[in-house]
Amino acid sequence: MNQTTANAAALALVGALALQLAACGTAQQSAPGQASTQPEPVTLTMSWWGDDARTETYQQAIQAFEAKLQYITVETTYGTIADEDQTADVMQVDWTWLGHDDKSANQFVDLNEYSDVIDLEQFSQSALDACTVDGALLAVPMSVTGRIFYWNTRTFEQAGIDAPKTYEELLTAGNTFREVLGEEYYPLAMDAAARMNLMVSYLESTTGKAWVADRQLQYSADEIKTGLEFLQALEENHVMPTLAAQQTNGTLDQTPMWQNGQYAGTFAWDADAETYRSALKNASGFLVGDEIAFGGQANGGFSKVYLALAINSSCQHPKEAAILVNFLLNEDMGASIMGTACGLPDSVTGRAAATAAGLVNPLVVEANNRMMAFVDFPLDPTFESPALAAVPDGLYAAVLTACSNGELTTTQAAEQLAEGITAVLSGVAAE
């Protein structure tokens, strides 16, 4: 069942529930002279951004919530990420918005104070930790994501080899592709953002150090140069094309090279498993691969909270807001409507409800499970700041493209990355 079909079923359920609860409420009205036991009416506001499907899902889940708790009314606003209402009582937030600074600590309620309302035990501790700043839980994670390898095994079969599981096999695959299939075939292809993630994974694997800790870059320019040489080796061994050769309009899954199998692998978000599979002209060979251990010091790479729900510190009814958050993420009724509209649920009960409703793609679960079982590091909140990660003008894209195209040496590129990242981190620390 897809999200749209499930939404139609959910809407019918909401209507039936509303009638049932209304009848119940009429029967239970206080007799003359008796004190009313009905709570005082409460109005909450909630904001989010996303596509039409996400908006429809939120609206239907909120209708179910209002039908269940008829004394609470939820007024909603939605649009784009740039114009989200920052004053709403309950906010969908990008995890990086928390900023891990004093400003965000003052904007949102510490949800630890409402652990009697929100069942925090349903969420992974690592995701809760990622939403915690100076001991305050500023948001509850809706979903956690990370990158993993996807392979088109049909192309590998044509080359006479298996999809790679080690760095050595990856390098060998590049040369085999060139010799057997030709110059236009590559085992891997990915954009600058994915290459930056892959480089950090390599460095963390070989050094055992997190990329950033305590708002400090943990790598010197010389160490970053080693990571850039790793990317360069992948290009030189025909594992992946240069960024100049790979320039495309749109995402990789939209390119003929991915669709027809010339690009036989990528390093992408677990949530995109079905996107890459369904884009293939022959999807029978699609495989969720294993993470590759590039070194023996750690399992490099990281997971990140995709989206979270926070309660504004200006909220006049924080307990009722917490009840709404718990309904959407943990309760069967809410979570079975929300499904995967905001990513694969991190909540155990939420994921179970979404799965029972037929809204969870097994490929995404497989990709998420493999990624989560491997990676040792959380994502630093500044890693995806616009100054660094924006495409095409962010530091990562500019430097990695110039290095890939030969406009910068690995030494020059490493120095620019170290200086630019340190400048962004210094700005965060100074706030």
Where are these regions (language model features)?
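Alpha-to-beta junction loops
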Residues: E84-T96, E184, Q259-W269
